[in-house]
Structures are given as C-alpha cells and as structure tokens.
Amino acid sequence: LEIAEKLNQIFHGSSRAHGTFTVENNIIGQKTQGKAKTIKTIGASIKHWQDHLEGKQGLGIIPIDEDNLVKWGAIDIDIYSLNLEKLVNKIEEFKLPLVVCRSKSGGAHVYCFLKEKAPAADMQDKLREIAAGLG
C-alpha cells in the first residue's frame, strides 16, 4: 500500500476524473489494445493505484487540476524500436529534468516533474518543444 500512496502523491491531478484501461492484448512492440474509459466522478484514489499495481486495472491520471495547473506532464512515445539508452543519453546531454520509463507496449513515457504547480498550457508548450528537440 505504501507504493500506491506514494504514486498517488507523485501523480496527483484532477480530483474530478481519471481514466481506466482494460487490456485486451499486450504484445510487446505493438500499441496495447483494450478499452479505455474516463470516469468523470472522482480522481484516482489509493485503491485505484493498488489495483493498477496488481495488474487488475490500467489507470490514467489527468494531470490538470481544477485550476488548470499541473505538477507533472508526460510525453508518450509510440516508437517500439526506440533505443531507450540513446534517449536517456540525449536527455542527460541536454541536462533536461526528465524521467524515462518503458511503456507497457514497448515505447516510452517521458515524465517532467515540477517543484511548484504551473499553468497546464505552459507545460504542454514546453513538452512539445522538448519532444521536437529530442526528435
């Protein structure tokens, strides 16, 4: 439960909605197929995170809060032949404050975390700029 609590703090977002994803196929090197739903009544809870960590239900966090502010953002890279080591080296070379994770389908998620909340539009602009710079 401790990990679920920590993830709930790190990936805090909307308190009004979250997403779920039920996997129908999970073939590495292909976009994972499944059913995505947006639950418009409540943000993600520790229970949602626990189910996600146990593989019971995929979880999608909406990073934008009710004031249109974010504390984190992500770039989703659906290139399955992506060399993660090269990507990480490029990020380190440019001293970018990013964290790279392999996605379940074999692509990557590149996360940017902030110390203070910022306007969502500013985060989106910066992530687009970074994505273009990384190629």
Kindly label every feature range from the protein language model.
Residues L59-I61, K95-C101:
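A short linear hydrophobic-aromatic micro-motif
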